[in-house]
C-alpha cells in the first residue's frame, strides 16, 4: 500500500471506543481521504451490472468520502463502492473502526481478498440526520462470505486479514430511495 493510502504512524484517540467502552489505544490509519489522488483509489459498482436501476457513486469533498445515490428495488436494489485491489496492511489486525455520518439506513462494510469476487460483509446501522459523527467497530471475524448475494461457507472462503486487497461499502437494505454515507476515516486495530 502506498504511503499516501496507509500511514503507519500510530496515534491515540479517546473518541474511539470499544464496545466495552475502553479506549482503543493504537490503530493504523487506512484511509483519511486527504490525499490528492484519494478518489482514484475507489470504484463504483451498482446493480446496473445485472440490469438494475439504482444510481450511486462517490466524491471526496472536504477530505471526506461521500457515498450517495438512490436505490431502486425494481432490479438489483444495490449500490456499492470499493477500493481498487491494492496491498492493504491488515496483517496482525483484528478489524476496522469507521467514523461516519449516515441517513438512518443500513449499510454493509465489504472486504475482499486478492482479485476475488467473493465479498466478506457485515451490516452496520446509521442514525438519521446525526448531528455528531458516529463510529463503528467491525471485527474481521464478524464478516460473512458471499458471492453475488449468495451466502458461502467452508474453509476456502474464510477471510484472512493479511490477504485483504479491497475494502468498501454497499447499500442493499431492500428499500427504495436516496442514501448518503459520509466517511471521515477508516482505521485498523
Predicted stretch roles:
Residues 7-189:
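Beta-rich carbohydrate-recognition modules and glycan-binding surfaces
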Residues 1-4:
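Bacterial N-terminal signal peptides
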Amino acid at each position: 500500500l502506498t504511503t499516501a493510502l496507509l500511514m503507519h504512524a500510530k496515534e491515540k484517540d479517546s473518541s474511539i471506543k470499544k464496545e466495552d467502552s475502553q479506549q482503543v489505544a493504537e490503530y493504523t490509519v487506512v484511509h483519511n481521504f486527504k490525499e490528492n489522488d484519494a478518489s482514484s483509489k475507489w470504484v463504483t459498482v451498482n446493480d446496473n451490472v445485472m440490469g438494475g436501476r439504482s444510481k450511486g457513486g462517490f466524491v471526496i469533498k472536504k477530505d471526506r468520502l461521500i457515498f450517495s445515490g438512490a436505490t431502486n428495488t425494481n432490479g438489483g436494489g444495490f449500490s456499492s463502492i470499493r477500493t481498487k485491489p491494492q496491498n492493504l496492511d491488515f496483517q496482525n489486525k483484528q478489524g476496522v473502526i469507521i467514523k461516519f455520518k449516515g441517513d438512518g439506513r443500513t449499510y454493509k462494510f465489504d472486504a475482499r481478498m486478492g482479485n476475488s469476487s467473493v465479498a466478506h460483509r457485515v451490516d452496520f446501522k446509521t442514525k438519521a440526520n446525526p448531528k455528531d459523527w458516529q463510529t463503528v467497530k467491525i471485527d474481521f471475524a464478524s464478516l460473512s462470505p458471499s458471492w453475488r448475494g449468495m451466502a458461502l461457507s467452508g474453509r476456502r472462503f474464510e477471510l484472512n486479514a493479511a490477504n485483504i486487497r479491497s475494502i468498501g461499502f454497499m447499500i442493499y437494505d431492500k428499500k427504495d430511495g436516496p442514501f448518503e454515507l459520509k466517511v471521515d476515516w477508516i482505521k485498523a486495530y
